[in-house]
UniProtKB/Swiss-Prot annotation:
Record's GO cellular component terms: cytoplasm
Lineage of source species: Bacteria, Pseudomonadati, Pseudomonadota, Alphaproteobacteria, Rickettsiales
Name of this protein: Elongation factor P
Principal cellular location given in the protein's record: cytoplasm
Organism: Rickettsia typhi (strain ATCC VR-144 / Wilmington)
Keyword Protein biosynthesis tagged: yes
Length: 188
């Protein structure tokens, strides 16, 4: 499917020079005083991992990869792979851990994720927007801290470090965004 250079967004997977590239940074739209407007895009090659900056005219059209999306349940780790089960057909799928990169600690047993396939090959895994995790380490609660809006460091059960409000204690469950690893609220 062809998309305008102005429509490119972070996370889009493009077919460029016969390779698959994921847009890794928010594209910069620039309109210089002289010449035509262009879009500066930082991309990462999904096969080799190399990064590249692409500059496209606002009038250019690029090929967006047509991905098939399946709901899968995470079962367990097997070596350097994740073993997932297609929730519709119950087929087991092995996916390399590298696909998740920094988001790997958010993966919990039986979590439902979306796996995006290109030509029947798993390309990306989309985690739920938020997860509920327990605080395993943080400073003690300070009395009267509900009034202030300051944050303190905390380590969650999966080892991720986040900033949490002063009134939270060890053992409490919180909601965390998976895209930028930030605190949202206390879990209900």
């Amino acid at each position: 499917m062809k998309i305008s250079a102005n429509s490119i967004r972070t996370g889009n997977i493009l077919v460029y020079n016969n390779d698959l590239w994921v847009v890794s940074k928010t594209p910069e739209h620039t309109q210089p005083g002289k010449g035509g407007a262009y879009v500066q895009v930082e991309m990462k090659n999904l096969k080799t991992g190399t990064k590249r900056n692409g500059r496209f005219s606002s009038s250019d059209y690029l090929e967006k990869a047509e991905l098939e999306q399946k709901d899968c349940q995470f079962l367990y780790f097997e070596g350097n792979n994740l073993v997932l089960m297609d929730t519709k057909h119950f087929d087991q799928i092995n996916v390399p851990k590298e696909i998740l990169e920094a988001k790997l600690p958010f993966l919990t047993e039986n979590m439902i994720v979306k796996v995006e396939f290109y030509n029947d090959k798993p390309l990306t895994i989309v985690l739920p927007p938020t997860v509920i995790l327990a605080i395993s380490e943080t400073d003690p609660v300070i009395k009267g801290a509900t009034v202030t809006s300051s944050y303190k460091p905390a380590i969650l059960e999966n080892g991720i470090k986040v900033k949490v409000p002063q009134y939270l204690a060890i053992g409490e469950k919180i909601v965390v965004k998976t895209d930028d690893m930030t605190y949202v609220e206390r879990a209900k």
